[in-house]
Amino acid sequence: MGPIRIGVGGPVGAGKTQLVERITRALIDEVSMAAITNDIYTIEDAKILAANGVLPEERIVGIETGGCPHTAIREDTSMNDAAIKDLVERFPDLELIFVESGGDNLSATFSPELVDFSIYIIDVAQGEKIPRKAGQGMIKSDLFIINKTDLAPYVGANLDVMVEDAKTFRKNKPFCLTNLRTDDGLDKVLEWIRHEVMMQDLQEA
């Protein structure tokens, strides 16, 4: 069956790498994990994850996509497919693999052949009207995250407006607010992973 693959997408600076770092730190004692980062010309995100996170360096793969980073997660996923295959061969016990996209726009989505679930993260500093634009990444993701809530007073963003707009386009699909710098709201993300992704409720029944 193989490990479950979770795609993590969002604009540059929204908190994708930090999200993966926080999730893996919280779940390290209960789940076997690895991570793949995509960027156009560097593997900087992979280096940051290795330096700041808890995953061993050999469980982190950095991909230099060249050109458009969206292509590597949607139209031509071959580099990511190869990285996943390599990780599974080296670590047969893997249960979760995170695939972080390069900084992308609001319309970027993951190929359903590449990932089983997807998270799309934005940050408050981009403005309260961002959820209203309802890009495909925000609409189609399995979990939508509005990050950096602590910045709202400084950028004039109304969190209540963002929440109402998110409710409108998400319908019944989950979303949450976070401040990953302090782990505020991380519990909601972990709950989603444990119950919706790992389906621990069924395993414990």
Swiss-Prot record:
Q: What keywords does the record list, in alphabetical order?
A: Chaperone, Cytoplasm, GTP-binding, Nickel insertion, Nucleotide-binding
Q: Which GO terms describe its cellular component?
A: cytoplasm
Q: Which residues bind GTP?
A: 10-17
> Pfam families annotated for this entry?
cobW (PF02492)
Q: Which InterPro entries match?
A: CobW/HypB/UreG_nucleotide-bd, P-loop_NTPase, UreG
Might you name a Gene Ontology BP term for this protein? urea catabolic process
In terms of superkingdom, the source organism counts as: Bacteria
GO MF terms held by the record: GTP binding; GTPase activity; nickel cation binding
Q: What is its main location?
A: cytoplasm
Q: Where in the cell is it found?
A: Cytoplasm
What is its biological role?
A: Facilitates the functional incorporation of the urease nickel metallocenter. This process requires GTP hydrolysis, probably effectuated by UreG.
Instruction: Write down the HAMAP family for this protein, in alphabetical order.
Output: UreG (MF_01389)
Spell out the family assignment given in the record's similarity comment: Belongs to the SIMIBI class G3E GTPase family. UreG subfamily.
* Quaternary structure (record): Homodimer. UreD, UreF and UreG form a complex that acts as a GTP-hydrolysis-dependent molecular chaperone, activating the urease apoprotein by helping to assemble the nickel containing metallocenter of UreC. The UreE protein probably delivers the nickel.
**What is this protein called in UniProt?**
Urease accessory protein UreG
Name the source organism: Corynebacterium glutamicum (strain R)
